[in-house]
Amino acid sequence: MFEPVTKLRVFGLPPGADFPKVLVAGLVERHKTLPPEALARVTLVVNTRRMARRIRALFDAGPARLLPKIQLLTDLGKGPETADIPAAVSPLQRRLELTQLVSGLLDREPDLAPRAALYDLADSLASLMDEMQGEGVPPEAIAKLDVGDQSGHWARSLQFLQIVQTFFGPSDHALDAEARQRLVVERLAKVWAATPPAAPVILAGSTGSRGTTLALMQAVAQLPQGALILPGFDFEMPVSGWHDLSNAMTAEDHPQFR
């Protein structure tokens, strides 16, 4: 599908474009002169079920043709390369486990928070764990943060952080979905570096806002037949805007930061 090049294949669509429609049109155009089975060899990785359904609907609208293999980011962990990675625990089970641990902490330290906040605290810790695992940030890195005059509040927060630490590193607890996804991406990156897929792999619709997804995008972009298609890319951003993105404190939430 792609001619050999020395640069990474990174494409983008501008804000306001009908991303699935333009994506399908581009794939069809690139395969006009190729054998019918060429499109069926393509693996198209997208980040939401809604986009996957829309892409499939656009192909189903005709004309009849062989279709690419459409996968979600989370489907990548279902292949033989990652069969030995344990399945992730359900989000509900993890929240119930966190609720029990938070309850025990509040029993020992009743001044930390009211009992009525038990479930909210468990939800907050679950969200924190997802973000930490998605970014590859261990609890030790957060514990070492210099928070200055917030030391009293921070000391209380660290007691809750110790609960999160229970689920990091070697433990008897099952993997969270984010932790498993990171292991899957690390495994695929290693396998692909040794034996790259011969067929095209296209990751479309992701910006790399999560660390795990960014790592996957980097791995795909390095493949001989890999490509990225970015959504909502601002091709008109001035040079000064690109310079501003180098400041993580002010630009981290920008979709083109990474």
Q: Over which residues does each language-model region extend?
A:
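N- or domain-start disorder-to-order transition segments that initiate the globular core
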Residues: M1-H31
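Structural motif corresponding to the C-terminal cap of alpha-helices
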Residues: L27-L34, L188-W192
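Short active-site oxyanion
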Residues: A40-T43, P200
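Short glycine-rich phosphate-binding loop at a beta-alpha junction
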Residues: T43-T48, A204
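Basic/charged alpha-beta structural segments of nucleotide/phosphate-handling enzymes
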Residues: V46-P196, G211, Q218, P224-Q225, ...
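Conserved P-loop NTPase "ATPase switch" module shared by AAA+ and STAND
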Residues: P197-S209
